[in-house]
Amino acid sequence: MQKIWLFSIITIFLITELQCYPNSAEERLLSYIFDGYNSLIRPVLNASSPPIEVFFSLAFVLLINVDEKNQIMQTNVWPTMKWNDYQMQWDPREFDGIKTIRVPPDKVWLPDIVLFNNADGNYLVSFYSNVVVEHTGDMLWVPPAVYKSSCLIDVEFFPFDEQVCSLTFGSWTFRKDELQLSYLSGKRHVELNDYLPSGVWDLIDAPGLLIDERSKISYQIKIRRKALFYTVILIMPTVLMAFLSMMVFYLPAESSEKITLAISILLALVVFLLVVSKILPPTSSTIPLMAKYLLMTFIMNMITIMVSVIIINVYFRGPATHIMPNWVKTVFLKFLPVLFVMRRPESTEKELAKMKREKRERRSMKSALKTFFKRNDAKISEQPKQTSRKDGSSSEEKLSSDAKKAIEAIEYITTHLTHDNAFKRQREEWKFVSVVIDRLLLYLFFAVTTGGTVGILLSAPNVFEQVNQTSVIERLKQQAAEEMLNS
């Protein structure tokens, strides 16, 4: 019985010992390299050793968003860091030829590389992936990260703008004599092997630059906005409204819709100004290109409303309140109609001719009546003297009195008709002056609007320059490959 108990105890002891002993090469390797390893110590032999060199590269995966209002760029990137830890070396022949292992990042020393121009307080990476360890002591760490970085947005040429946003990485605690950065495999540009093109921005270039004596590395992300969306949604309606406001001068002055149309366009422009103000940052350094054009259109529309009021006032003028100056007749009734190839309505011309003809006829009739009555007076004075002096004098006075009354009546009617026709003629002249002013302002506003549209919208440097994103990505990939070969 005692022998059985002794055999059982020995068997249990042997099984326990076998389970505690590493039964694979990888387990033995991990026990070997972490025996006495301290992840808090910078992997250098002594304090006087040269600074540890961390090789850094950045893989650009996705441009998530550019928030112009808050001046923030959100990106999905893969920062790649490589350094050498002399404590993590082993001979692969002693561990079944194992040359590479993967360990959790909290088990080894990591360089505290963070994004300096962070905008949301999240300086570290979002996911701590495993560290790849080579038997030579080379450590490779590629943690994926989603960064929100601050970016100074230049809205001068919006929506045809280019932006240059930086991603600046560096050690948060180590001095430049303790840690230095270098390009990984000579890659001076971001890697674009896994880049997904954005639907809003085109990537133009993304060079890297070592700064502050190699203690930091800064990548300049140069992007250009795809303006098609804003061209269709914002620019084209604004341009159409700018030219539509000129149609106010094509409406007749007696139309009640002249001012209504101008005010409706003005309200639409106010709405577009509010839309632009919500998109762009409230900066006072520059005025956006689109805001300049909207402001120009807004001012032109305000002038249109004021001038339309003046035109309507001119249209309803008459000789009772306004006497047309000679210079107005010369400019607006003689010179400008010829310049603009304008003719007065035929009815007006016929009416003027009829008025002149009637005036001549009235003058002729008046002259004939005067001659007729003078002859009658002469005949009466030559009658025989037998007629009593009293009767002759009475008859002559009666005839002369009737003639004078008839002449006065004719003169009154003639004067009234003349004044009435003159009143109508002057009213028609004022109406025609308003039509000429409308035509003058139509041409003038068309020239100013066209010139302003071309001058403002075409002042952007990249209006007609199209970006082939596929070609740009291939060019940058090829450039990165050449940098690797030359390193």
Swiss-Prot record:
Q: Which residues, renumbered to this chain, are glycosylated? A: 46
Membrane topology category:
Multi-pass membrane protein
User: What are the alphabetically sorted keywords of the record?
Assistant: Cell membrane, Disulfide bond, Glycoprotein, Ion channel, Ion transport, Ligand-gated ion channel, Membrane, Postsynaptic cell membrane, Receptor, Signal, Synapse, Transmembrane, Transmembrane helix, Transport
Q: Where is this region: Disordered?
A: 380-400
InterPro entries (UniProt xref): Neur_chan_lig-bd (IPR006202), Neur_chan_lig-bd_sf (IPR036734), Neur_channel (IPR006201), Neuro-gated_channel_TM_sf (IPR036719), Neuro_actylchol_rec (IPR038050), Neurotrans-gated_channel_TM (IPR006029), Neurotransmitter_ion_chnl_CS (IPR018000), Nicotinic_acetylcholine_rcpt (IPR002394)
Q: Name one GO cellular component term.
A: synapse
Q: Does the keyword Membrane apply?
A: yes
- The chain's Cytoplasmic topological domains, given as residue ranges, are 315-439
Question: What highest taxon heads this organism's lineage?
Answer: Eukaryota
Q: Which organism is it from?
A: Caenorhabditis elegans
The name on file for this protein is Acetylcholine receptor subunit beta-type acr-3
Transmembrane intervals: 232-252, 259-279, 294-314, 440-460
